[in-house]
């Protein structure tokens, strides 16, 4: 570990999303032998409070407190740079609070911003795309997590006509991705597709799967010929 910079992953939001990000790192690393892989540390903390509940005022406990503890654990374990396996956790109210807690602890850990790297990745890989569909949680929409950054980049964000399909796909107690992620239920997959259809009908040229659990339901690279953006791949 001391010879190579270790990558930290803060997971647990839900747990499968962190595992998925770790798998992506392995899959995208070009190697010829085991020893060529990048040291990776996954800290999966299911005690991190729900991000959307906090953002919508249903909870007063900022998830950034628990997130900072997890990131500090990663740093103590040898991580020099870390990613957070949750889109909604990157809202300013949570992400900035997390960074402030790290600063108080005199941490030198570099924490990547998932939304920023995703927008940069879209501009680099799909330079002609201007109309960008966003699929995410209510917290992601309410706090314009992607909207503001896309608009700043000269892109037009598009949202589904209704958020209920995605909320059910993610949170349903029986068929939702959080309850049933391996494998994801066909009910959840179809609900995600219905939301994708809505932004495609508005003219989306690419669609962001803006919740780290959505790529678990839809691992395909395209849908009806439209590129699906998995932010974890840009992280």
What does each model-identified segment do?
Residues 1-235:
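Non-catalytic structural scaffold of enzyme domains
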């Amino acid at each position: 570990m001391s010879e190579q910079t270790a990558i930290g992953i803060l997971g647990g939001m839900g747990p499968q999303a962190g595992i998925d990000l770790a798998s992506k790192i392995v899959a995208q690393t070009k190697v010829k032998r085991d020893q060529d892989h990048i040291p990776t540390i996954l800290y999966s903390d299911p005690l991190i409070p729900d991000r959307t509940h906090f953002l919508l005022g249903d909870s007063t406990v900022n998830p950034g407190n628990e997130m900072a503890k997890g990131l500090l654990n990663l740093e103590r374990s040898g991580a020099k740079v870390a990613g957070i396996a949750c889109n909604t956790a990157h809202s300013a109210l949570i992400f900035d609070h997390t960074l402030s807690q790290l600063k108080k602890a005199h941490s030198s850990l570099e924490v990547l911003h998932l939304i920023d790297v995703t927008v940069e990745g879209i501009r680099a890989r799909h330079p002609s795309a201007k109309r960008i569909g966003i699929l995410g949680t209510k917290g992601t929409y309410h706090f314009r997590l992607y909207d503001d950054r896309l608009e700043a980049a000269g892109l037009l964000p598009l949202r589904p006509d209704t958020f209920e399909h995605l909320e059910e796909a993610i949170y349903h107690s029986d068929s939702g991705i959080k309850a049933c992620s391996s494998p994801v239920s066909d009910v959840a997959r179809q609900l995600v597709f219905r939301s994708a259809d809505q932004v495609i009908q508005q003219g989306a040229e690419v669609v962001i799967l803006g919740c780290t659990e959505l790529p678990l339901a839809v691992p395909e690279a395209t849908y009806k010929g439209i590129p699906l953006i998995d932010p974890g791949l840009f992280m």
